[in-house]
Regions:
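Catalytic domains of carbohydrate-active enzymes, especially glycoside hydrolases
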Residues: 104-130, 234-237
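C-terminal motif of bacterial Sec signal peptides marking the signal peptidase cleavage site
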Residues: 18-21
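Aromatic-lined carbohydrate-binding/catalytic grooves of carbohydrate-active enzymes
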Residues: 116-154
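Active-site-adjacent "subsite" loops/lids of carbohydrate-active enzymes
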Residues: 76, 84-104, 164, 174-175, ...
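Aromatic- and glycine-enriched glycan-recognition loops and surfaces
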Residues: 97-116, 143-169
Length: 270
């Protein structure tokens, strides 16, 4: 056997030994399969995904404090009746009634208004430059006692009485004034107590016997304003109404113009 052949035999032997070793290593390894049991969770055990709530935080400027006024509840309807005192139309029915009789008549009228669901009365307190209340500006009314400037006896204040009795019944009491009528033709004789005598410079006598304050005269305007302010400041009234707040009807003065050229021009030129 020559040398070359020996080398070949040796090389082949080495290859066989190597292959045998690799095969032996592979066969020594075992693959183990593990059985994994899977279970389906019960519906009650299934957890719902947690909901994530994102709060939106709004940033804004602080609101300014709003000034609020608490007002009394207002009646839905104004159901009022007028109570006229001029010429004793509604109250008092006569000029010579006693204090007790006057009060009884007032209560009867107010009870009637309450029974018929009225919620306000408009009471005439100044029919003709006079007063059916205690006034420091004008005399007691002729229509109350039959004598201008004479107070009721036994004494009481009619306006105060009407306010109290109306409010007891849940009825508002509004005062009614005639701002320019200074003396009514049915108001008896003009006496020293009358505004006609106390303030003649701003009062005009009409041809039908009435006397009228001159609306353009500042003295008239100031006087009427003081009368209203006096009532509002001293009585718990619910409103103020004006009637005959204009120049007299043409028929009152026989169709003649009201003599106010001087005061009217002065008023316009203010």
């Amino acid at each position: 056997m020559n040398l070359k052949f020996k080398y070949i035999i040796t090389f082949l032997s080495f290859v066989l030994i190597t292959l045998s070793s690799c095969s032996s290593n592979k066969s020594s390894k075992k693959i183990v399969y593990k059985k994994v049991e899977t279970t389906t969770p019960k519906p009650s055990e299934t957890k719902k995904p947690t909901e994530t709530v994102i709060a939106k935080i709004e940033t804004s400027k602080p609101k300014e404090e709003v000034f609020k006024v608490t007002l009394p509840e207002v009646n839905r309807e104004f159901r009022a009746a007028w109570v006229a005192t001029v010429a004793n139309i509604n109250w008092p029915s006569k000029r010579d009634l006693t204090t007790v009789q006057q009060k009884e008549e007032a209560i009867k009228l107010l009870d009637m208004l309450e029974a018929n669901n009225f919620n306000a009365v408009i009471f005439q307190v100044r029919p003709a430059g006079d007063a059916l209340y205690k006034s420091n500006f004008e005399p007691w009314s002729y229509f109350l006692t039959g004598t201008e400037g004479k107070a009721p006896s036994p004494y009481y204040d009619p306006l105060e009485f009407w306010v109290d009795e109306a409010h007891k019944r849940g009825i508002e009491l509004h005062v009614w004034l005639n701002p320019y009528r200074a003396h009514h033709s049915s108001g008896g004789p003009v006496t020293s107590e009358s505004m006609v005598k106390k303030s003649p410079e701003n009062i005009v006598r009409l041809k039908n016997g009435m006397y009228w304050f001159d609306p353009a005269d500042k003295k008239t305007q100031d006087h009427v304003s003081e009368v209203v302010k006096d009532i509002v400041s001293r009585y718990d009234i619910d409103g103020v109404h004006f009637d005959d707040y204009f120049y007299p009807y043409a028929s009152y003065n026989g169709g003649a113009d009201f003599p106010d050229n001087t005061t009217w021009n002065a008023y316009k030129n203010k």
